[in-house]
From Swiss-Prot:
It is found in: Mitochondrion membrane. It comes from the Eukaryota. This is Respiratory supercomplex factor 1, mitochondrial. The gene is RCF1. Its main location: mitochondrion. It comes from Arthroderma otae (strain ATCC MYA-4605 / CBS 113480) (Microsporum canis). The lineage of its organism: Eukaryota, Fungi, Dikarya, Ascomycota, Pezizomycotina.
Length: 187
C-alpha cells in the first residue's frame, strides 16, 4: 500500500502535463539542426543508390553507398558534438524538470490532503450529529411515562406548551420531536 500513489480527484487533470512530443521535437531540431541534415543526406544517398541500381549503373551505386557512409558519419559527429555542446543545458533542464515534478507532486499531495481533511470534517460532523440524535433518543426512552410531575411544574409546562407547539406537531415528547428539535432547532 505504501508504493501506491495517493488517490485524488485531480489525477485526470491535463494541466499536470506540459511538454507535448511535437514541441519537444521542434526544440530538438532547433538545438541540433545538423542531425536532421545528416539524416536527409543519408536518405538521399540511399535513394540515389536505389535508382542507380535500377538503371544498372554500378559505378554510381558504389559512389552513392560511399556518400551514404559519409552522411552517416556526419550525422554521428553532429550527434556527438551536439551532446557535448548542450550537455550543461540538458543538465539544467533535467534539474528544472525534476523541480517542476516535485512541485506538481506537492500540489497534488496538498490538494489530496485538503480533500481528506474536508471529508474527515464531514465525517466528524456526521458522527457528532448522530451521537446527539442517539443521546436525544436515549433521553426520551429514559423519561418515565407513569409518573406525574409536581403540580407546580405541570402548570408551568402547560402554560409554556401552547407557545412552544407548532401546528402539525404531535402532543407527545417522543423520539420524533427530539429529532425534529435537533435538526430544525428548538422552536
Amino acid at each position: 500500500m505504501g508504493d501506491k500513489p495517493l488517490p485524488s480527484s485531480f489525477d485526470d487533470n491535463p494541466d499536470f502535463f506540459q511538454d507535448n512530443p511535437w514541441k519537444k521535437l521542434g526544440r530538438r531540431l532547433k538545438e541540433e539542426p545538423l542531425v536532421p541534415l545528416g539524416i536527409g543526406a543519408t536518405c538521399y544517398a540511399l535513394f540515389r543508390a536505389y535508382r542507380s541500381m535500377k538503371m544498372g549503373d554500378s559505378v554510381q551505386v558504389n559512389r552513392m553507398f560511399r556518400a551514404r557512409i559519409y552522411a552517416q558519419a556526419f550525422t554521428l559527429l553532429a550527434v556527438c558534438a551536439g551532446s557535448v555542446y548542450y550537455k550543461t543545458e540538458r543538465d539544467q533542464r533535467k534539474q528544472l524538470e525534476k523541480a517542476m515534478d516535485l512541485k506538481k507532486q506537492q500540489t497534488k499531495r496538498d490538494a489530496w490532503l485538503k480533500e481528506l481533511e474536508i471529508r474527515d470534517q464531514e465525517d466528524k460532523d456526521w458522527q457528532s450529529r448522530h451521537a446527539a440524535i442517539e443521546q436525544a433518543a436515549k433521553g426520551a426512552e429514559l423519561k418515565p411515562l407513569g409518573t406525574d410531575p409536581a403540580p407546580e411544574t405541570a402548570e408551568r409546562d402547560q402554560a409554556e406548551e401552547p407557545a412552544a407547539k407548532e401546528p402539525g406537531e404531535g402532543s407527545g415528547g417522543g423520539v420524533l420531536s427530539a429529532v425534529k428539535n435537533l435538526t430544525w432547532g428548538s422552536k
